[in-house]
């Protein structure tokens, strides 16, 4: 019976794919409730076995894919032998794909601070036998030290460096800058994915040397202006910093659009002034 109900839920859910209906809180709450009660323990994603978090926060048991446009983009932009950083690796959806794309001659560094997520990330990497992945249970930010990290009481993707109504508890966790962590790395870094709940600005400030030394580094980051502000980052300053060192921006809005289109700072700030209930991804690439 549980499988039949899940199948009905899955078909109903797919009707709304590409509509961004998930931006609404009541929809997210309903999905969390249904996912918690109906989801399987694991799913297969492109040949990879993935154990899910308690509420299937990425809806992988429903969609079989997460952020389709971004998933397709990384397949085009990441190549065999590349070095990739997954900042905010969660339970490993992108980490596993990166590991396959870079192959045995490449390397993936996956950063995930939250303990339960980290254990699932480790389990998913190990069960798929990816020995080209390095797992790091640290926060990536603009300083090294111990920081307070707030754990969401609703799902596994809403953990933040600032306190909100969603926070159920907090933990102390080690923070690092990418400049410090990779100061002795001899290979170039090719690609960074950042999804850290508004912490992208601080993480960027902590990788100034890395950005300088890796001229062709490509970045995908979450664009959530309100989260940046709550992390004491001015969204415009963050974009201008990247623009100053040669980056152009491309919008990945998660709807049914097929093209990833260039967008200016002015257009971004006008289109997503606060993004209180919605966020997108940005592809940042030097011309």
Give the ranges of each region predicted by the language model.
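A short, compositionally biased
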Residues: 34-39, 144-145, 243-246
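Non-catalytic surface loops within mature trypsin-like serine protease
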Residues: 54-56, 142, 151-153, 223-225, ...
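Short internal loop-to-helix segment that lines adenine-nucleotide cofactor pockets
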Residues: 63-83, 130, 134, 143-151, ...
């Amino acid at each position: 019976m549980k499988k039949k109900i899940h199948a009905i839920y899955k078909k109903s859910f797919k009707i709304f794919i590409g509509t961004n209906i998930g931006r609404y809180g009541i929809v997210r709450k309903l999905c969390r409730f249904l996912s918690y009660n109906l989801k399987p323990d694991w799913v297969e994603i492109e040949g990879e076995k993935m154990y899910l978090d308690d509420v299937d926060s990425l809806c992988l048991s429903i969609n079989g894919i997460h952020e389709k446009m971004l998933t397709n983009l990384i397949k085009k932009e990441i190549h065999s032998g590349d070095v990739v950083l997954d900042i905010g690796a969660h339970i490993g959806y992108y980490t596993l794909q990166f590991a396959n794309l870079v192959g045995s001659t490449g390397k993936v560094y996956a950063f995930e601070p939250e303990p339960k997520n980290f254990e699932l990330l480790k389990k998913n990497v190990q069960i798929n036998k990816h020995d080209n992945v390095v797992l790091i249970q640290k926060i990536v930010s603009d300083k090294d030290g111990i920081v307070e990290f707030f754990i969401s009481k609703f799902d596994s993707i809403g953990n933040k460096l600032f306190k909100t109504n969603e926070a159920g508890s907090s933990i102390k966790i080690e923070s690092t800058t990418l400049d410090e962590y990779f100061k002795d790395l001899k290979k170039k870094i090719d690609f960074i994915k950042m999804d850290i709940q508004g912490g992208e600005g601080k993480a960027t400030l902590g990788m100034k040397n890395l950005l300088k030394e890796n001229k062709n580094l490509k970045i995908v980051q979450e664009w959530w202006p309100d989260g940046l502000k709550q992390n004491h980052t001015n969204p415009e300053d963050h974009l201008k910093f990247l623009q100053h060192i040669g980056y152009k921006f491309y919008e990945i809005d998660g709807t049914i659009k097929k093209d990833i289109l260039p967008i200016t700072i002015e257009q971004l700030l006008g289109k997503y002034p606060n993004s209180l209930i919605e966020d997108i991804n940005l592809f940042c690439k030097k011309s």
